[in-house]
Amino acid sequence: MLELRLVQGSLLKKVLESIKDLVNDANFDCSTTGFSLQAMDSSHVALVSLLLRSEGFEHYRCDRNLSMGMNLGNMSKMLKCAGNDDIITIKADDGGDTVTFMFESPKQDKIADFEMKLMDIDSEHLGIPDAEYHSIVRMPSNEFSRICKDLSTIGDTVVISVTKEGVKFSTAGDIGTANIVLRQNTTVDKPEDAIVIEMNEPVSLSFALRYMNSFTKATPLSDTVTISLSSELPVVVEYKVAEMGYIRYYLAPKIEEDEEDKA
């Protein structure tokens, strides 16, 4: 038996909005420690990792490990029927083929039940090794979203470079080029407005902007975003989900064509 009750139902709606365009079908894994998802996008370029820890739920019952295959588009349609202030409860029986979403209004004068069929989804669980990153940038999430959106009007690849001077986002396209430089800034009134750059080694890596723009759909979840970069590893773009977990997006860097030509 599985029963999860989330008072901040809007969190779950925002989580779905931030992953449904990348991943069509995925398994939600429930264990005693939390509710999680790990899935590749359809073109196997990006990986999404979600964790909502059990202690963040008002009520969390998971008698045994359960994996529920869901179509995220359909799940999102159901969650859209919940009001932003609604309490959301997720229920499923062990071995059952459906999951029930229950939406309760804050005054508890309206309760809606939506039942959705589960799917059988084959998914390999990819071990994500803990790594030491050469550079880590923490910045306001809406600023990162704006940069990705602005650069997409010029080009389709962003080069993220971290040096002693700061972090530079640049692109080039048919109409010209664009460079946006952010310097470390911790003298701010609100901690979420700070730009913090931890650089162990300088890095410069290229990424597809359409994926970066997709990742920024998680902006409503968190005021800050953390970008971890290393020359040999995929970038990690992480958004915290309230105090209860995170969404992490992993994206492999693009190999520049001219480097391939040299090889």
Curated annotation (Swiss-Prot):
Alphabetized GO MF terms: DNA binding; DNA polymerase processivity factor activity
DNA-binding region of this protein: 61-80
GO cellular component: a single term: nucleus
UniProt keyword list: DNA replication, DNA-binding, Nucleus
Signal sequence region: none
BP terms from Gene Ontology: DNA replication; regulation of DNA replication
InterPro entries per UniProt: DNA_clamp_sf, Pr_cel_nuc_antig, Pr_cel_nuc_antig_C, Pr_cel_nuc_antig_CS, Pr_cel_nuc_antig_N
Database matches in Gene3D superfamilies: 3.70.10.10
Main location: nucleus
Localization: Nucleus
PROSITE patterns according to UniProt: PCNA_1, PCNA_2
Pfam families assigned to the protein according to its UniProt record, in alphabetical order: PCNA_C, PCNA_N
Origin: domain of life: Eukaryota
Family designation: Belongs to the PCNA family.
Protein's job: This protein is an auxiliary protein of DNA polymerase delta and is involved in the control of eukaryotic DNA replication by increasing the polymerase's processibility during elongation of the leading strand.
Protein name: Proliferating cell nuclear antigen
Organism of origin: Brassica napus (Rape)
Lineage, top ranks: Eukaryota, Viridiplantae, Streptophyta, Embryophyta, Tracheophyta
